[in-house]
Each structure stands twice: as C-alpha cells, then as structure tokens.
C-alpha cells in the first residue's frame, strides 16, 4: 500500500527523536492502560494465535502500531502528522504451506486512523481491534487475499511482564517498556483464505507494549516467543542481539495455570539456534528452531512453516520473521504452540 505521507519526509520526521529518558515504575491502571499512550514514542497491540477448522490448521497475526512524530509536535496545522498508525496482518496456511500478509499506514485523525486513550480501540480504515466492557476483543481485518474476523475472550488474568509491568530491554534504565500480556485467549470466528471461508476455534496471545526507547545502540534486533501451553501455562522469553549474534539482554516470564507469574532475570534466559532457513527473497538467515533455556526449564521452539518472513517496508520499514511455532519440552514432547518473532536479520532494526 502506498503510504499516506511521502516516505522520505516520514523517515526524516521519525529520525528527529530526542534523547530518551527512563520510564518510572508505576502501577498500571485498567481499563485506562488498555488504551493508547500518545505521550510516549512507540506503542503496539499485538495478537497471535493458532486456530483449527476441521482438519485445517492456521496461524494468525495482527498488530497495530502507534508512533509519535516528534518533529511535528509543535506545528499548529491540523494536518500535521503528529501520530502515525501502522497495521500488519497475516495468516499462515499450514495445509498449503504459505503465508498471506498485508500492511497499512496512515496519519492519525480525520476518521482514517485512530488509537483511543481510554481503552483498546485502534483502527486504520476498515481494520479494527476493539475491546468491549466485558473484556473481550473483536478484530476485523479484511485484506486483498485474506480476512480475519475473530473474537477473543480472556480465560486468565492480565499478565504484567517484568517488574509489575515495567520490562527492561537493555542495560540502561531508559531501555524499558510498559508491557502486559493476555495469554490463553479463547479465539473464535472466521478466517478467509484466497476466497474460501473457514469457521475456526483456537487459542491466542495478546501483547500491549509502549515505550520511549527500546533498543540499545549495540542491539540489531531481537528474538521473542509467546507460548500458550496445553496445560494452561504461559511462557514468554526474549533476548536482544548484538551484530555478532551475542545476547545483549534477555528476559521473560513463566506463569503456571492458576498461579502467580515468575519474571526471569536478565542473565537467566539463553537462546541457542539449532536450525536455520534462508529467505530466497532477502537472503536473510533465520533460526527456525531454537533451544531456549529458562528458569522454568529447557524448551525447543520449532517453526511449523519455515517461510514466515514478512516484508513491511511499505509501513514500518522492517523485514522480519513472525510465525506459528510449536513448543517442545526437554524430552521432545510437544507441550504448546505460539509465535516466534525474529527481527534484525535482514538489516538492523531501527526503533
């Protein structure tokens, strides 16, 4: 899709960010913090999941981003692009071994794009994610070759990541975000793939994260997993990488079903690549199988389809890998499914 702003002007505006500052530790307040935080630079709402329709299996991903444009904040014009909204959507069709994806971008306002500050209600033209007063979510994202029309119902409490919702992302205090998850969402609805509709049921994971700064100057990207286990547990793990592949920072959490979450320390999570896939389009090499050691145990994460690379250079400017994967325990037994995200392999991630 063609951006609503000239690409060069957009990149120059985003490059004009001032120095970041450390986020204060604070108690997240709901439902207010389900909404947007336009005073901070970057924010996203992200839902991934696994769904079935008879013998057919699918993965799905939808993400809405909000980005503050600092270079325009003092402009008086009502047409100044002070906030941008981006959106990505994708379906992984396991039977046909293919990924369908789409992207959008627009300046906030004028009835085109919005991100409510009172609760989750983000939209970009006819793409929408809205939270109801009962706590459920409704996602409607029609695209050219596919469509998502899904409803999500929480089955567990909100999971505050890091230190009561303040999640460090690097060795310096300003490298942090406010971050919560809603794992084990019950998902129902309809997926349309190449004109064919499927009534589906499944399980999903929601992340909502907002920050003034995320990446240390040495970080080129990150690897992240959000896994819904079959027994109702939830596993989060991530690390940020330097250019040589070494870990700059790591973290995550483990929440058994019905129990309190346990946050992982910065040195307690280790990612080890076990198998790589090279994209025929970008020539980027992605580890599509990982061994991940955590305080909750050792796990293997294995992509269910190697080619789940997304080219979002028409919106956020990044090429990344985001895909449905399975989780195996230390004995090799499948124990859950979720999504693996890998950034910074095609080029250094800019945030």
Where are these regions (language model features)?
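N-terminal secretory signal peptides and thylakoid transit peptides that target proteins
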Residues: 1-15
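Structured soluble/peripheral alpha/beta segments that form catalytic or ligand/cofactor-binding pockets
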Residues: 21-351
């Amino acid at each position: 899709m063609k951006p609503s702003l000239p690409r060069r002007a957009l990149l120059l505006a985003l490059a004009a960010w001032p120095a970041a500052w450390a986020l204060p530790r604070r108690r997240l307040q709901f439902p207010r913090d389900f909404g947007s935080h336009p005073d901070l630079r970057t924010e996203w709402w992200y839902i991934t999941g696994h769904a079935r329709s008879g013998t057919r299996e699918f993965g799905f991903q939808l993400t809405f981003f909000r980005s503050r444009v600092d270079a325009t904040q003092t402009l008086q014009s009502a047409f100044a692009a002070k906030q941008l909204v981006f959106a990505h959507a994708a379906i992984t069709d396991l039977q046909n071994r293919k990924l369908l994806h789409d992207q959008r971008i627009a300046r906030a306002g004028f009835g085109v794009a919005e991100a409510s500050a009172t609760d989750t209600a983000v939209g970009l033209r006819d793409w929408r994610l809205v939270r109801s007063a009962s706590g459920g979510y409704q996602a409607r994202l029609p695209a050219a070759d596919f469509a998502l029309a899904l409803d999500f119902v929480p089955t567990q409490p909100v999971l505050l990541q890091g230190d009561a919702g303040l999640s460090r992302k690097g060795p310096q205090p300003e490298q942090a975000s406010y971050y919560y998850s809603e794992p084990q969402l019950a998902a129902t609805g309809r997926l349309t793939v190449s004109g064919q509709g499927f009534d589906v049921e499944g399980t999903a994971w929601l992340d909502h994260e907002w920050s003034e700064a995320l990446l240390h100057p040495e970080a080129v990207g990150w690897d992240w997993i959000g896994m819904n286990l079959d027994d109702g547990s939830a596993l989060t793990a991530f690390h940020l990488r330097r250019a040589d592949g070494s870990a700059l920072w790591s973290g995550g959490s483990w929440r058994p079903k019905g129990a309190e979450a346990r946050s992982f320390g910065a040195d307690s999570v280790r990612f080890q690549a076990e198998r790589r896939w090279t994209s025929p389009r970008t020539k980027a090499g992605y580890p599509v199988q990982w061994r991940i050691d955590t305080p909750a145990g050792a796990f293997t994460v294995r992509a269910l389809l190697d080619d789940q690379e997304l080219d979002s250079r028409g919106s956020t400017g990044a090429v990344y890998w985001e895909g449905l994967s399975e989780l195996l325990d230390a004995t090799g037994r499948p124990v859950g499914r979720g999504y693996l995200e890998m950034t910074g392999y095609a080029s250094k991630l800019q945030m």
